[in-house]
């Protein structure tokens, strides 16, 4: 594990960019960027286009301002290159950004008010590959739809079970038990989640990171942020607009952003580089300001 990267993730001001759209969400991401589905004929072409979009973002001067401390990548982006360098190496060596890899394979159908991650027996193999690419950590998402005690306990147990396997490969996991912002009893679900997270953290011997939905009650996750086994807590934008997400985030001290959609809002394939860079820089500045409050 890279100690300098560990320090950066523990305390550097800034936020984590999420560029980890996978097969299912790529068409939506491309459409928002102004590339219609008829612009590509195959999955291969679709992934090439999204790689071009991500390359444009990562090589933009806006990405070199030191305000983004980490970035979450999709597998194919990790295996790809930027300006002739493997993506993770380019991020760290040219941008001083810590690379993470999305490792889950999507969600199971809802049961007990939650969606667990699909089983993934190849997790260890993917972790080894990530280590070979000089990736620092991972991220995996599951979703809480209802304030169901059993369901939430299952979600947290699965996240920590995967997390321990990831740690055994020398990677730092970002656990992401997202609470759906439309959950009818969101505050109650968050109470159960916090209790279960603290119970698991108390049993850990190595620190992890956590990615959460911005809580209903401001500063609700304070004990988790201060827990010795918690490296950093980041927040997802969860369907809020960037403005709304930034506003909510700025009220939660010690939590930094890990936005995907909110980061690419307003970017378009048709923009000139100057327009694209200016828009990206403004987005990064907004999210950064909300993260350091």
From Swiss-Prot:
Catalytic site positions: 176 (proton acceptor), 211 (schiff-base intermediate with dihydroxyacetone-p)
The protein's Enzyme Commission number: 4.1.2.13
GO molecular function: fructose-bisphosphate aldolase activity
Annotated GO biological process: glycolytic process
Catalytic reaction annotation: beta-D-fructose 1,6-bisphosphate = D-glyceraldehyde 3-phosphate + dihydroxyacetone phosphate
InterPro entries in alphabetical order: Aldolase_TIM (IPR013785), FBA_I (IPR000741), FBA_I_Gram+-type (IPR023014)
Listed pathway(s): Carbohydrate degradation; glycolysis; D-glyceraldehyde 3-phosphate and glycerone phosphate from D-glucose: step 4/4
Primary enzyme class: lyase
UniProt superkingdom: Bacteria
Pfam family, one: Glycolytic
Keywords, ordered alphabetically: Glycolysis, Lyase, Schiff base
Keyword Lyase tagged: yes
HAMAP family: FBP_aldolase_1 (MF_00729)
Protein family (similarity comment): Belongs to the class I fructose-bisphosphate aldolase family.
Protein name: Fructose-bisphosphate aldolase class 1
Lineage, highest ranks first: Bacteria, Pseudomonadati, Bacteroidota, Bacteroidia, Bacteroidales
Gene: fda
